[in-house]
């Protein structure tokens, strides 16, 4: 499968939570982690623009395996991405809500973000009032979509293809990455064939030394234990 769309750009591969069901806390042992720099982000947007010119770019998620609002440039990133992304395509990300403020939310809305989804994970258990305020605030500012609250680790649990010790519900979905030509650009510019590739095992290139037209998407070892099917 050839590359068709940049599904995700990982604004941050660092998280301020340490959830048992998420590999974010361990991924620094396996790959470079941190906040995506503006140089890397601008280069990643060139790949988005390449897909957009061909009419294949779909939604863009500024979320990978980390908390995007920790990146101090997240508003600027949204503004630049909105300029490149076709108007009909959604620009969004997920947040744990820990650091979301109304000032930040309105700045993101002004920068062109379509919606923000909230994950009810460890942060909610520790500080439900703060995360509930975030949800209320985003709703009041029309920045959440119906069903924009994630409780997947409870109602549709999976073990991230064996990367964490967590129950697997057995629910199977078709893999959108290998069947629809999607990739995620990681915080250091590496390109992976899968959005749950926390440890960087499916790298197929880098935005600086690869060309979009040369990217080939193929199954890799995580596919064998993944909850998605090809």
Annotate each predicted stretch with a short phrase.
Residues 3-8, 162-230:
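Accessory C-terminal segments flanking Radical SAM cores
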Residues 20-22, 74, 104-105, 128-131, ...:
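Short aromatic-enriched loop/helix-cap "lid" or pocket-rim segments at secondary-structure transitions
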Residues 14-16, 27-29, 68, 98-100, ...:
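Short, solvent-exposed loop/turn segments at secondary-structure junctions
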